[in-house]
Amino acid sequence: MAIARYPSVVIDCPDPRALADFYGAMLDWRVEDRSDWVEIRSDDGQCISFQYVEAYSPPRWPTQEAPQQMHIDVVVDDLDAAETAVLALGATKHEHQPGTSFRVFLDPAGHPFCLCLD
C-alpha cells in the first residue's frame, strides 16, 4: 500500500504566478494561488507547484555552470503544432536539439522542458 498519493513537483522561480500561468495554459490545468506558492492541478489531482526564490538563477543547460534543477517532458501528438503553441505562451526554443523525437525549450524562468512524441 502506498504511503502517499499524487506527488507534487515543486519548481523554484522568480515569479510563481507567471510560471504557473505558463504551465497551466500548456497543460490546460487550473491555477490555484496558495499563501506561499502557486499550484497548477489537473482534474484527476496531479499537481505542479511553483515557489518564489529571491536570488533565483536559471539553469544553463546543457553545461553545468548553473546545473539543471529539473525538467519536464510533455508528450504531444504533433511537434510542430506544439512548438508553435508553447512559443506563443512565452517559451524559447533551445539552440541545442540533441534528438529527433523531442524538442527542447526553456520556460519563461529558464527551466528546460521537452515536447516529446509518444
Predicted regions and their residues:
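Mid-chain, well-packed structural core segment of small domains
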Residues: 64-87
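Short, acidic, Ser/Thr-enriched surface-loop or helix-capping motifs
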Residues: 107
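Short hydrophobic/aromatic patches at helix-to-coil boundaries
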Residues: 115-118
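Core segments of cupin and vicinal oxygen chelate
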Residues: 3, 7-53, 81-104
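Short secondary-structure boundary/capping segments
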Residues: 1, 39-40, 61-64
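A short, acidic/glycine-rich surface segment
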Residues: 55-61
